[in-house]
Amino acid sequence: MKETIKNMAAYEAELPVAEVKATYGVSHVARLSANESPYGPSPKVGPAIRDVSDDVLGFYPDGQATALRQAVAKLEQVNPDSLVFGAGADELIELLTRVILTPNDNVIVPNPTFGEYAMHAQIEQATTKSIPVNQDTGHVDFDAMFDAVDEHTTMVWLANPNNPTGVFETRSDILSFLQKLPQSVVLVVDEAYYDFVDQIDATVIRDVKDYPNLVVLRTLSKAYGLANLRIGYGVMQEPLYQVMQAVRLPYNLNTYQITGAVAALSDQLYLQSVVAKVKSEREKFEQFLTKHQFKYYQSQTNFLWIKVGDAKRVGEALLSEGYQINDRLNAEWIRIALGTVSDNEGMQRILLNF
């Protein structure tokens, strides 16, 4: 067993809804800890999956996910032969680190950010350098991240918008940073929450063709409401594309996943309606936080990062009323996914006590 992972803690999943109801005696539980969508997927998804013939069950699925590959390539205007699919973006994060990192390497990440980047570096016995974000705005410190690059740096991770801060960096700032990096350093831009961004200059996905050391990740778990189906994809150039295709598990997306994803992508009007609801609720919640003098960062996602003093105490108070939020990331900050109107108003009433 690798010494670096011998004492690694397992992922702590959300408490089952039934357990929360039984423990706290509540009739309604709002799952707002994993940034899932309270609105669910497009109404086209369920019927599409149910229409899949039982005849396919005895055969392996399309190992190239051809229908999904074509749908994503058309929607995002990228080369279909630059797409690698995975069971959520999580699988692609794991594969990228496995393919790129060696025990002598280091990776650079903002702090705070999504914990899986450092976790998978640890599994590969690489070192992670964490660079604090701007404490006032939450923006990534690109200068400090560049200064941290050395001869052993092989990857830089950038969640954009960042998780858990929700803060968004512009395409121009990202490309300026990328252009300074050595070609030997791969910049992975994780755009899991891109669909919620309402600013221009929002994505670098179509810049991959111009930069061999740029990779972009996406997921259908958030705005598309398909967290249970586990669908993610990455856009990258050769030779990384071919190596990733060789290393990933064959048939890693089944027919139901592929069919549901294609149906979801075909319904952009539904996606737009979800994003509009999230934006409206985000703006109202931020107005509440400003009015009551909570520190938070301006978000371009479906969640908020809020300083509350004692995260565990506030998290327990919310959970006791049926609101599951994430209080495990920082001792003083909580991450709250935006729920329905009534859920958000209910959480605000509780936050007034702190």
UniProtKB/Swiss-Prot annotation:
Name by which UniProt lists this protein: Histidinol-phosphate aminotransferase
UniProt family annotation: Belongs to the class-II pyridoxal-phosphate-dependent aminotransferase family. Histidinol-phosphate aminotransferase subfamily.
Annotated positions of the N6-(pyridoxal phosphate)lysine modification: K222
Quaternary structure (record): Homodimer.
InterPro entries assigned: Aminotransferase_I/II_large (IPR004839), HisP_aminotrans (IPR005861), HistidinolP_aminotransfase (IPR050106), PyrdxlP-dep_Trfase (IPR015424), PyrdxlP-dep_Trfase_major (IPR015421), PyrdxlP-dep_Trfase_small (IPR015422)
EC numbers for this chain: 2.6.1.9
The keyword Protein biosynthesis is assigned to this record: no
CDD domains the record matches: AAT_like
Gene Ontology biological process terms in this record: L-histidine biosynthetic process
A Pfam family per the record: Aminotran_1_2
Organism from which the protein derives: Leuconostoc citreum (strain KM20)
Keywords, comma-separated and alphabetical: Amino-acid biosynthesis, Aminotransferase, Histidine biosynthesis, Pyridoxal phosphate, Transferase
Pathways involved: Amino-acid biosynthesis; L-histidine biosynthesis; L-histidine from 5-phospho-alpha-D-ribose 1-diphosphate: step 7/9
Any GO MF annotation of the entry: histidinol-phosphate transaminase activity
Known cofactor(s): pyridoxal 5'-phosphate
Catalytic activity: L-histidinol phosphate + 2-oxoglutarate = 3-(imidazol-4-yl)-2-oxopropyl phosphate + L-glutamate
PANTHER family: HISTIDINOL-PHOSPHATE AMINOTRANSFERASE (PTHR43643:SF3), HISTIDINOL-PHOSPHATE AMINOTRANSFERASE 2 (PTHR43643)
